[in-house]
Amino acid sequence: MTLFSYLVSVAENENFSEPERLGQLAGRLLPKLSQQQRWSLGWLGHYGVGMLFALVYVHLWRSGKLKHDLLTRIWLGGVSGIIAVAVWKATFKAHPRPPALSYDKYYIQLVPAHMVFALFAGLGYQMLNRNHHCILNKSEYAKINR
């Protein structure tokens, strides 16, 4: 997903990197942060949200609420992208010093970026699921989620 955003950034000649935007927003709220701290916060936030999305996907697949197929992964990514657009819009609106940015282009690229993320999250899930000792099977998962 992040690579997708970087590629769109190059094509549009504008920075759409989510971790860099998060770091920029943090730095504008806390100007005493060093560049390294801003960078770290941006990446930590970006990966943290990515982990939350991935955990939701795994829950939906493990519980049997959604199929684990290509179409479902694309759909999950699209829904995740729409959620991301809403969260980013709210974040930029609430921030006292939002960045100068082509917001429409930024929001539009978030949807396919999240589709890419969901496709690769599904691929990772599929690869890990082949090793039964790595991930709980459905009956074990159901027991701990009662």
Question: What does each of the following model-derived ranges do?
Answer:
Residues 1-146:
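Short amphipathic, positively biased membrane-proximal segments
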